[in-house]
C-alpha cells in the first residue's frame, strides 16, 4: 500500500487530464464527426473520408498525440425527399497521453437526418446521434513507482503488480447534436450548430470509484462568403464547455481559386484561428479534385509558452469527398469547410 502512493498520484493526474482531453482539434472544421454528430453525411458527394493528426505540446514529454479517422455517407436517397439527407458514419480515435503512459481508443457510429425547410433546399435543420465504445489503458512501464527511487538513485525495477481491472477501463458513451444550414443564393453558406457529449455520464475510474464524466457542450458556427467570381472568405468559430473548463476558438481563411474554375477548382487557403488565452494558430490548406489537405501550428501565447517554448503543436487534416457520378446532379447546400 505504501508503494502505491506515487502510483495513485500519477493515475489521478492522468485521469483528470484525460477527461478534459476529448478530441480537441485546432482544425475543428476539418473533423466533422467529432465536432457535431449532426454533421454525419452532411456534404455534397457520395461518401467522405476524413483523417486528423495532432501532436500537442511536443516539448513536454509528448503530452498528447491524437489521431482520428472517419467515414460517412448519405443513404436512402431514393426513399426520402430530394432535398433531405439521411447520413450514417463510423469513426475511430486514438490518443496517447504522457508519452504513452495513458492510451485511449474508441470506435463510434453515427446517424443523422437533415430536413429541408424550403423547396429549393436552401435551408435545412438536422439532428444526429452518436454512440462510442471507449477503452483506456495505463502503460505502467511508463510510470515511476516509489520503490524505484532509493538513496542510491533510480533502480528502474519495481515490485508493483496490477490486476487487469486496475489498468484497463471500458465504457459506452452517447453524444447528440443539432445543426442549421442555410444560403441566400446558392453561393454563400452559413451554419450554426450545438452538440452535447457524454449524455449518459459514464463512470471513468481505474480504482472502481464513482467519478463520472461531465457532459461537454459545444456551440459552433461558420460562413462562406464569396469574393468576386471564384474566391471566398471562410469563417468558423467553436465554443466548448465542460464542468468549469471552457475553450473558445475563432478565425477564418481566405480561399484563392488558383485555376479560375468553379466546377473543378484548385483552391489555396490561408488564414489563422485564435484559441482564447492559449494560442495563435496559422492555417494553410489546399483543395484539388476530391481532396482537401490542411496544416496548422499552435503558437502558445499563454503562461504555458515558457515550458512549451511557444510550441503548442502541429496538426494535419485530410478529407476526401467522392463526387457524384452524374456531373449534372443537383448540388446540395452543405457547410463548406
Question: In which residue ranges do the predicted regions lie?
Answer:
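Sec-dependent signal peptide recognition
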Residues: 2-10
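Sec/Tat signal peptide C-region and signal peptidase I cleavage site
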Residues: 15-20
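Subset of outer-membrane beta-barrel
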Residues: 21-337
